[in-house]
């Protein structure tokens, strides 16, 4: 119970108020990840996703271009 009371008093004494800001300050953890590393990781994800779509996406793309009637069948 003492742990809750001490964290409550720490929160009340800081300058962060309101619902949106009612979370602990996590800037210490965010400094461990660099923006350059994050951008590199995101670039790798985008490339892998684009390669997968180029290989297997062509037949699905052609099928999706065919108009469908109201009963769900494709018309030719």
Swiss-Prot record:
Compositional bias annotation for Low complexity: 47-57
Entry keywords, A to Z: Protein kinase inhibitor
Native species: Sus scrofa
One record GO biological process: negative regulation of transcription by RNA polymerase II
Region (Disordered): 1-25, 47-76
Upper classification of the organism: Eukaryota, Metazoa, Chordata, Craniata, Vertebrata
InterPro entries in the record: cAMP_dep_PKI (IPR004171)
The protein's name in its UniProt record: cAMP-dependent protein kinase inhibitor gamma
Biological role stated in the UniProt entry: Extremely potent competitive inhibitor of cAMP-dependent protein kinase activity, this protein interacts with the catalytic subunit of the enzyme after the cAMP-induced dissociation of its regulatory chains.
Assigned GO CC terms: cytoplasm; nucleus
